């Protein structure tokens, strides 16, 4: 067990506090909204003909965390923790970008949400999830690996742990 967890929390204490402050609670599950997002993404085709991939891993994340704007509840370990929202429509027009990165990673990616500035909600990076549940961020400086699953990614974003930069080779 990690030292900053209690026996009753799924997440580290500061991550759990941020999630609960945003409206999350254990058992939260809005599959109806998740399916609406899935249908919207499936129906969208870019002018270049690119379409979104929708995976069960993405739908499950949207059902549990969708619609939440999550802000950190304390200082970061090594970086300033991120404020973000889980809303796949933030990536509606990013089908080609996600397809290109997915091809490089030999997987398929689906939009998850976006990192924002804490005070203005201006987008800073696109959050994406692959078919295995791994989570990534894509911004103007590059592509980043946030964790092997949504729990690890939330911890990375909210704790100020550095993400892993994706590089060629």
Language-model regions: role of each:
Residues 125-127:
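Short, surface-exposed charged micro-motifs
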């Amino acid at each position: 067990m990690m030292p900053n967890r209690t026996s009753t929390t799924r997440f580290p204490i500061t991550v759990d506090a941020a999630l609960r402050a945003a409206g999350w609670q254990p058992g939260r599950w809005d599959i109806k909204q998740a399916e609406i997002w899935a249908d919207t993404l499936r129906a969208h085709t870019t002018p270049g003909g690119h379409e979104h991939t929708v995976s069960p891993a993405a739908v499950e994340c949207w059902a549990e965390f969708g619609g939440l704007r999550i802000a950190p509840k304390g200082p970061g370990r090594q970086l300033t923790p991120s404020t973000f929202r889980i809303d796949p429509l933030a990536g509606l027009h990013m089908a080609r970008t996600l397809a290109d990165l997915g091809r490089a990673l030999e997987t398929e990616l689906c939009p998850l949400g976006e990192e924002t500035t804490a005070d203005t909600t201006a987008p800073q990076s696109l959050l994406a999830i692959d078919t295995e549940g791994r989570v990534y961020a894509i911004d103007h400086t590059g592509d980043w690996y946030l964790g092997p699953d949504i729990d690890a990614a939330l911890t990375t974003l909210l704790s100020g742990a550095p993400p892993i930069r994706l590089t060629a080779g």
